[in-house]
């Protein structure tokens, strides 16, 4: 593999970008109380909404670094544009224009990413100054406009830098840059997770429990890979057409339908949605019994539930299921795909006449 110069350069470039990303994840935002950040790290609060946000940021949120927002604003921006493509004809036409249209959509995605980063960084700054999501530990002393502005601009610039890194990896590295950054973020948390599990189990003489956890982790990885690689292939046959003296078409191909075509995107989007109730709860006044009750309920069941509240588990699960269904529908439109196949003279073998293909493909996708 390393004997191929171009492949070697791409691998080394990707690893170098990973190093830059991990370096930025350890640089704290100016204006943050580092002692409070250390207390938060020592407390080990890694569950609930805070734990999910910290996971996808690669631990950058735990240290309140310049990359604390991670790649989540970009993912949210991409999903928003894909949703708008369904309802705005102009965006749909741009998507069908090929490379030139994709460049315009990519540019709009960048603009929306910066706007979302400004909004999310402002919300996180406000929440962390009030001690929400952090067990009452305030990370930002002296909550002044100048300090808040500095923190917000720094975190927004960090998100823009991560977006640029992802695009560089896509162009000069291996694979999709944004997906690899998410992968690097999650992988970076494994040593600390295994270290904590070892201290709790093997460090207290329960080596069997630690071995069982490692075995279950490996089996889960194997199972995830198995499901991720699973696909249903729908055979497509193209009819022969005569143009002059040439016979066109007649070849066979297939449409690969993945079992999990949405990937981890619905989980990220659901986590972003869960962030807003915590922000609203922080803004509610406590001098009123009704608003104080609502705020306490959100804190117990969502913001600081540590992932054990039944409502948190149910609500997050429903959000993931909804966004998975919705995102899959947007990613692959069976009706449009069927029309394209029909216009090109293709059909599903065993399904005649050709006009029935537009009914067959959506039915298979629903199953």
Model-derived features: where do they sit?
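N-terminal cationic and glycine-rich segments that engage phosphates or anionic surfaces
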Residues: 1-93, 100-356
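Conserved small/polar residues in nucleotide/adenosyl-binding loops
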Residues: 357-363
